[in-house]
Amino acid sequence: MKARLLFLFLFTFSFINTVKGQDLITFKTYDELNTYIKENNSKPLVINFWATWCAPCVKELPYFEKLNQENQNVKVILVSLDFEKQVESKLIPFLKKKKIASTSIYLADKDYNSWLPKIDKNWSGSIPATVIFNQDKKIFVEQDFSNYEELNTFVNQSITK
C-alpha cells in the first residue's frame, strides 16, 4: 500500500515544475488538458495558446497577466506550445523572469492534427490563439491583441453573450 501511494505521489508531481510560486503543469495529451478545463470551469476560462518563440505571443502576455489580476470574473490559463527540449532551458526561466502568475500549462501533445479541430474546426494552428469557455459556449479567435483594452473588451463581450 505504501509503495502504491509513493508511486502515485511521485507520478502526480513528476509533471509539475515550480514557477514563481505558481506551478507549471505539464499535460502529455490534449485529453488531459480537456479534462482539466472541464474540472476548472466554475467561471469563464480565457485560454491563450502561445510559445516563447512567438513574438506576438510574448508581446501580448502582459495583457493576459493584467486580465488575470484585474478581472476576477474569469480564470486565465496560458497554454505553452513550446518545444519539449526547451521547457527547462527557455519556458520555465521565461515564466520566472516575467513573474507570470496566471495558471501556466505546457502541452506536450505534438499530434496537432488530432487536437486542433477539438479547439476549433477552423484553427490553422497558428499562434497566438485564444479560446473562451463560458458554460456551454466557446468563442475562438486566431489573432493577437494590440493592447489590454482590446483583450478586455473581447473577453467582456464574449462572457456576456
How should each PLM-predicted stretch be described?
Residues 61-98, 112-115:
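Structural microenvironment flanking redox-active thiols in thiol-disulfide oxidoreductases
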Residues 24-44:
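A short beta-strand-turn-helix
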Residues 1-28, 160-161:
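Bacterial Sec-dependent N-terminal signal peptides
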Residues 49-63:
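Conserved redox-active cysteine motifs that mediate thiol-disulfide chemistry
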Residues 44-45, 128:
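Alpha/beta-hydrolase fold active-site loops
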Residues 95-127:
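Short, internal strand/loop/helix patches
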Residues 126-140:
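A short, hydrophobic beta-strand/beta-hairpin element that forms part of a small beta-sheet core
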Residues 46-47, 76:
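Hydrophobic beta-strand anchors of alpha/beta hydrolase catalytic cores
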